[in-house]
Amino acid sequence: MAVLKDVKRLVVKVGTSTLVYDNGKTNIRRMHKLISVLSDIENSGIKVTLVSSGAIGVGTGKLGLPERPKDTPGRQAASTVGQCELMYMYDKMFSEYGHKIGQLLFTKSDVESPERRKNLINTFDTVSYTHLRAHET
């Protein structure tokens, strides 16, 4: 961890191509490796925040759809199923390393509104303080 010796907080963004094979199935091996590495970094004393997309991709595979939906209702349906699956997998895998996780959802308007941004920052600080993982979609 010599490269990260002065780092106190690390934000890692993973996308659909990291989490899902081209055939739409979840890349479990890659997820395990990612979570193993992030858990080790967290254990070294660096606070880790995982920012993850991939809900539509995971949902597409879980629903057995032949391809990623192109219409908004289809993407929302796949995302709904995929988000549950993704959080279940993150929770299960992080718990193997003794880490609890949480999910923090926000939108562009939450960041743009001063009051909502303040609430978001307070929530994020509290989540970080309690060593929970934050997850953004």
Task: Identify what each model region corresponds to.
Residues V11-K13, K47-G59, I101-L104:
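Short beta-strand segments at enzyme active-site cores
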Residues L86-M87, K92-K100:
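Ordered, amphipathic secondary-structure segments that act as subunit-interaction surfaces
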Residues T18-V20, A55-G59, V111-E112:
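Short, active-site-adjacent cap segments at secondary-structure transitions
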Residues G61-Q83:
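A charged helix-plus-loop insertion that forms the helical arch/lid used to bind
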Residues N122-D125:
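A short aromatic-anchored loop/beta-hairpin motif
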Residues T130-H131, H135-T137:
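Conserved small/polar residues in nucleotide/adenosyl-binding loops
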Residues S109-D110, P114-K118, S128:
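Hydrophobic alpha-helical hairpins/lids featuring a short glycine-rich hinge
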